Amino acid sequence: MVSFKSLLVAVSALTGALARPFDFLDERDDGNATSVLEARQVTGNSEGYHNGYFYSWWSDGGGYAQYRMGEGSHYQVDWRNTGNFVGGKGWNPGTGRTINYGGSFNPQGNGYLCVYGWTRGPLVEYYVIESYGSYNPGSQAQHRGTVYTDGDTYDLYMSTRYQQPSIDGVQTFNQYWSIRRNKRTSGSVNMQNHFNAWRSAGMNLGNHYYQILATEGYQSSGSSSIYVQTS
């Protein structure tokens, strides 16, 4: 469920140099919305750095989705009757780091709270799903085993996307999944343990691009408010 989209975002007009608890994602690649924003209807997809963290935001433009970046690693997403979006904060490149995170995640319908990243050579989109809404993405993927880590069992899956949007345009690529059996919205994720488990299951990664603690939604509504750190 990935789509990088032109996001439909409603932003209230702001005047003056007011300090804001959140920065709205604007159209500049650096993502630092420190200047006054004017009212706008459409914000383009973007990635860059904000308060020392890498961020990525993509939407297919359907429905309403609003992404706001707070202090440090904090971000917030609100969405209603959306198409497909995925966004969050983390690092570039991805590594086997241990990721600490917490916050709230309240999907009404289909949505994921996950560690999300990409590699090249091979081109792979990967997910470590910590919580999800009404749809378990493993239900239509190939089960490749399990791994016990960070206090629970994760089921491993692989699926293939044919001629779909990716970090390198429209491509065919594999998706790797680790799906936690008991959902949670805070904790630690040892990514090296997942990478090792995938490799043992024949699911090989390439050279890492970004790695974020992401919120993703598809044809749903909801909200999330998340912070992320590394140990």
UniProtKB/Swiss-Prot annotation:
Where on this protein are sugars attached?
Answer: 32
Q: Which residues form the signal peptide?
A: 1-19
Claim: Translocase is one of the keywords in the record: no
Identify the enzyme class. Answer: hydrolase
Determine if ATP-binding is one of this entry's keywords: no
Q: What is its main location?
A: secreted
Regulation affecting activity: Inhibited by the proteinaceous endoxylanase inhibitor I from T.aestivum (TAXI-I).
The UniProt record describes its induction as: Expression is highly induced by xylan.
* Subcellular location(s) of the protein: Secreted
pH behavior: Optimum pH is 8.0.
> What EC number is given for this enzyme?
3.2.1.8
Role, per record = Endo-1,4-beta-xylanase involved in the hydrolysis of xylan, a major structural heterogeneous polysaccharide found in plant biomass representing the second most abundant polysaccharide in the biosphere, after cellulose. Plays an important role in causing fusarium head blight (FHB) on cereal crops.
The protein's name in its UniProt record? Endo-1,4-beta-xylanase A
